[in-house]
A protein has these predicted regions:
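Aliphatic-rich helix starts adjacent to a transmembrane/signal segment
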Residues: 1-2, 6-56
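N-terminal pilin/flagellin-like segments and related low-complexity appendage regions
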Residues: 45-221
Length: 221
């Protein structure tokens, strides 16, 4: 009987040790998985930010000083201010600093106080043309290759001489010989303002432009 009790006590110690080891292993695995996920998210964020930085100031064939706004270009809802204004393409890359209240560039109010904001303006590196590059017989003066203009985007119509910034919902600048932008291509306009959003866990966020049902608006992503 005594031997049985001793064996049971020893078994309890062994089982308790095994359970403790299992709990410790589980905790270690959970922590490792969390850090791995954080590392993966960090690498993805750096990849996106690096790509946007490489394209800062790229507006197709045109240089920023040669780009003008179309007369029908609508204002952006909740636009940023100063050099950070969405359609101020000449200031295509700069760094601002949030104040002590977490406010910056007129459109950010939730940044980590005294943190940096990186503003990047460019076009998507994918030209849209009237098909002439692929088929000399398809020269209609209408952007249709590889797709038509979307009514919920903003574009830069550009050639090597000049460019026009316009809403996709409006009539596009003419691209025929003698037109607004002769032999021009359309490029989707992009705006990013990267910053660290304040909170229990600060996170990398960005302001972009997106169609809100009535026009282009600055939103948080």
């Amino acid at each position: 009987m005594v031997e049985l009790l001793v064996a049971m006590v020893i078994s309890l110690f062994v089982i308790g040790g095994a359970i403790s080891l299992l709990i410790a292993s589980k905790r270690s695995y959970t922590e490792s998985e969390r850090y791995a996920r954080m590392g993966e998210n960090g690498r993805f964020a750096l990849q996106i930010l690096s790509m946007d930085l490489r394209h800062a100031g790229f507006f197709g064939e045109a240089a920023p000083p040669g780009i003008e706004a179309d007369a029908g270009l609508d204002d952006v809802t909740d636009d940023c201010t100063g050099e950070a204004a969405v359609y101020d393409v000449e200031n295509f890359l700069f760094v601002a600093r949030a104040d002590a209240d977490g406010e910056a560039i007129g459109c950010i109010d939730d940044a980590v106080p005294d943190s940096d904001v990186v503003v990047i303006k460019s076009v998507r590196p994918r030209p849209l043309s009237d098909g002439e590059r692929d088929d000399p017989g398809d020269d209609t003066g209408t952007i249709d290759t590889p797709e038509s203009l979307g009514g919920t985007n903003t574009y830069v119509m550009a050639n090597a001489i000049n460019g026009v910034l316009f809403d996709g919902a409006d009539t596009a600048p003419s691209i025929g010989i003698g037109g607004d932008v002769p032999l021009g291509n359309a490029w989707e306009y992009r705006y990013q303002a990267y910053y660290i959003r304040d909170g229990d866990v600060p996170q990398l966020s960005r302001k972009i432009i997106r169609w809100d049902g009535a026009g282009m608006a600055v939103v948080t992503e």
